[in-house]
């Protein structure tokens, strides 16, 4: 296989989106549209990816990083003009070049690989990715000769009655012989009503030069959907979501109700895990085998080991080890690590906390900036008092400790191994190993107190 290059057009402003965010940066299933395109190219081991930027160039660069090459289109003079901005980076190279659009996020590596294979088998100068639609109104039509080669692409407004009856359309996606592309591109003129340079003219230029131009029909036309407004964005989101769900289910994941579940592109889930309705799995979240996620679990960049149960809870930038349970109604904030066979129960908040194996924080507690050992019990209502108004301080609770209900651990403080903290205590000094710490007022009972107090309706003597 020859060397593969790609030009991705991402210079348009996208006024129909009616947004401050540049069009190609609008997300589909958690990832900017243009990132989907670049990632697909990267998965195909494309050697050179040149992204043509214009409006929002800095924002696009910030999202995509430095793994691609950028070409700047300062003036918007048409698609051929946009492609030509990549010439300094590609025109002297051998091989095949893809032409793609940053607002066409659904194209799969399977489809593009098939396009590439067909292009090389046909030894064509250019191969057009086409699609057959039930209603082709508004699209450029593919006109073929008797041999099935592409003669020309006719825009809808310029098409004859017979040409308008053609349902095979130009998707705008191409494979080119790289050297022939740049030679033909130099011949494109702007003698049209809009005064712009159109990349579709390259097909005619190549044909006039006696070159072979063919078309490859996409098996799934929906993959070629371009996004120009919020309606089409929602359609792309729905398609991508279905693709993601189908992939996970075919790999052995049970998704009870795909219509009420949201899973982003880069999420990984192992077999025999069950995802319940209302769950959101985002970012770089990974879920092991035999887990139960949801209902109503919201996980962002979370590492979940096998056999974990998470329900009605929010977890962000954290990790939970095998056979643990989280929820219902827990909030696990960034930097938290939950050990194996641990329990994080209802209305518990963790922040930058390390929870040991077999430790239980069953309910109504805040554990922040803390390291809790193995086999610890944190009683209901326990608070790590970590903030003095300027600095966050650390709380350490060692293995086997028992913290009674409604205790305050005022950091920095350490509770020793197998130590006890009596319920209702405010601990502001270290507790030695195996000790019992009691930090509360001794109870005093005032005998016959009630009879001495005035009450409504009670006659005073």
Swiss-Prot record:
Q: Which residues bind UDP-N-acetyl-alpha-D-glucosamine?
A: 9-12, 23, 73, 78-79, 101-103, 140, 155, 170, 228, 333, 351, 366, 377
- The EC code for this enzyme is 2.7.7.23, 2.3.1.157
SUPFAM superfamilies attached here? Nucleotide-diphospho-sugar transferases, Trimeric LpxA-like enzymes
Cellular localisation: Cytoplasm
**Amino-acid positions noted as binding Mg(2+) in the UniProt annotation, renumbered to this chain:** 103, 228
What function does this protein fulfil?
Answer: Catalyzes the last two sequential reactions in the de novo biosynthetic pathway for UDP-N-acetylglucosamine (UDP-GlcNAc). The C-terminal domain catalyzes the transfer of acetyl group from acetyl coenzyme A to glucosamine-1-phosphate (GlcN-1-P) to produce N-acetylglucosamine-1-phosphate (GlcNAc-1-P), which is converted into UDP-GlcNAc by the transfer of uridine 5-monophosphate (from uridine 5-triphosphate), a reaction catalyzed by the N-terminal domain.
Q: What is this protein called?
A: Bifunctional protein GlmU
- Protein species of origin: Brevibacillus brevis (strain 47 / JCM 6285 / NBRC 100599)
* Organism ancestry: Bacteria, Bacillati, Bacillota, Bacilli, Bacillales
């Amino acid at each position: 296989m020859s060397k593969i290059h790609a030009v991705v057009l991402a210079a348009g402003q996208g006024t129909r989106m009616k947004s401050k965010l540049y069009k190609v940066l609008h997300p589909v299933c958690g990832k900017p549209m243009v990132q989907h395109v670049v990632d697909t190219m990267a998965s195909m081991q494309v050697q050179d990816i040149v992204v043509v930027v214009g409006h929002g160039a800095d924002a696009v660069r910030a999202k995509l990083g430095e793994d691609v090459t950028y070409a700047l289109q300062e003036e918007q003079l048409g698609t051929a003009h946009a492609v030509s901005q990549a010439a300094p980076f590609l025109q002297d190279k051998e091989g095949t070049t893809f032409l793609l659009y940053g607002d066409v996020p659904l194209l799969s590596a399977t489809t593009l690989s098939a396009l590439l294979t067909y292009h090389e088998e046909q030894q064509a100068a250019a191969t057009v990715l086409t699609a057959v639609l039930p209603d082709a109104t508004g699209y450029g039509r593919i006109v073929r000769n008797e041999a099935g080669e592409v003669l020309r692409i006719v825009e809808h407004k310029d098409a004859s009655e017979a040409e308008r009856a053609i349902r095979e359309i130009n998707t705008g996606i191409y494979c080119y012989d790289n050297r022939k592309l740049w030679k033909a591109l130099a011949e494109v003129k702007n003698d049209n009503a809009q005064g712009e340079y159109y990349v579709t003219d390259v097909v005619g230029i190549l044909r006039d030069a006696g070159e072979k131009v063919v078309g490859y029909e996409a098996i799934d036309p929906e993959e070629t959907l371009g996004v120009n407004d919020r309606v089409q964005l929602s359609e792309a989101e729905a398609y991508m979501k279905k693709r993601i769900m189908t992939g996970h289910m075919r790999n052995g994941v049970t998704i009870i109700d795909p219509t009420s579940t949201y899973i982003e592109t880069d999420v990984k889930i192992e077999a025999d895990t069950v995802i319940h309705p209302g769950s959101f799995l985002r970012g770089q979240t990974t879920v092991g085998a035999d887990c139960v996620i949801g209902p109503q679990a919201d996980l962002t960049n979370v590492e979940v080991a096998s056999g974990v149960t998470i329900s009605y809870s929010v977890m962000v930038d954290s990790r939970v080890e095998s056979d643990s349970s989280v929820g219902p109604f827990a909030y696990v904030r960034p930097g938290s690590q939950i050990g194996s066979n641990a329990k994080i129960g209802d209305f518990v908040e963790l922040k930058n906390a390390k929870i040991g194996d077999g430790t239980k924080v069953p309910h109504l507690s805040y554990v922040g900036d803390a390291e809790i050992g193995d086999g610890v019990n944190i009683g209901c209502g326990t608070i790590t008092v970590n903030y003095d108004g300027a600095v966050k301080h650390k709380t350490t609770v060692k293995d086997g400790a028992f913290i009674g209900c409604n205790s305050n651990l005022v950091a920095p403080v350490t509770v020793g191994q197998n130590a006890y903290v009596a319920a209702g205590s405010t601990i502001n000094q270290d507790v030695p190993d195996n000790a019992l710490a009691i930090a509360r007022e001794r109870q005093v009972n005032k005998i016959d107190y009630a009879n001495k107090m005035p009450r409504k309706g009670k006659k005073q003597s």
